Design a protein with these regions (language model features):
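Non-globular, low-confidence helical/coil segments that flank catalytic cores
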Residues: 1-214
């Protein structure tokens, strides 16, 4: 239906890459933007995105941060008078977006307190017809366990799983992988990163469960 959504915006130096890609797709308006959580590798370029594109609605977890990067994003939202909504998960939470696509918010689960910023990540499941994609941000084992305990298991099965936290070993538990049961997995990771992502344990788990990954 021509509707657009952007989830996260990398470090600030990658804004030209984001802008070039969106322009190549003919995108001038982003109907929905999601900032999964306030770490700079997810919102570093977000202020520039807000400044340079029309945005219909902006979602982020209700977990303020004190960094200059976060403050720039909030200031840009205020300057552009963008409608901002909390990303709060439940079995019925959804983003009003494309009428042909269901965009469910699974986490952070309403009423739960999270200490680690990674675990407040907005976990988004998009479904269109028989195809679905789960975007878990940096949600680690704790957040995944809470989702599994608080939400119906029917919320999780997805055709494609973006592996949480760039393939960190503390963010892809067997129960979560089995609940999602993806046909394939995608790992978003910088080559030669300082953290050793993706961790070999995660790759071994995916292979053991018969989940191809890219």
């Amino acid at each position: 239906g021509g509707y657009t959504m952007l989830i996260d915006a990398a470090e600030s130096q990658y804004y030209p890459v984001i802008e070039e890609f969106l322009q190549e797709q003919g995108v001038e308006r982003l109907d929905v933007v999601v900032a999964s959580h306030p770490h700079s590798d997810h919102i570093g370029a977000m202020a520039k995105v807000i400044q340079n594109f029309e945005i219909g609605a902006f979602y982020l977890p209700d977990k303020p941060h004190t960094t200059a990067t976060y403050e720039r994003m909030i200031q840009a939202l205020e300057d552009k008078e963008v409608a901002v909504y909390p990303a709060a998960g439940s079995k019925d939470a959804a983003i009003a977006w494309d009428p042909l696509v269901t965009a469910s918010i699974l986490s952070p689960v309403e009423g739960v307190s999270y200490d680690d910023l990674n675990n407040v990540s907005a976990v988004i499941r998009l479904s269109y017809g028989d195809t679905s994609i789960l975007f878990p941000g940096d949600a680690e084992d704790e957040a995944q366990e809470i989702m599994l305990s608080k939400l119906p298991l029917s919320c999780f099965p997805s055709s494609v799983l973006v592996i949480a936290h760039h393939g960190s070993s503390n963010a892809s538990s067997d129960p979560f992988l089995q609940a999602v049961d993806p046909s394939l997995a995608v790992i978003s990771v910088g080559e030669g990163n300082d953290y050793g992502h993706p961790h070999q344990e995660v790759l071994d788990n995916l292979e053991r469960l018969g989940i191809p990954y890219y």
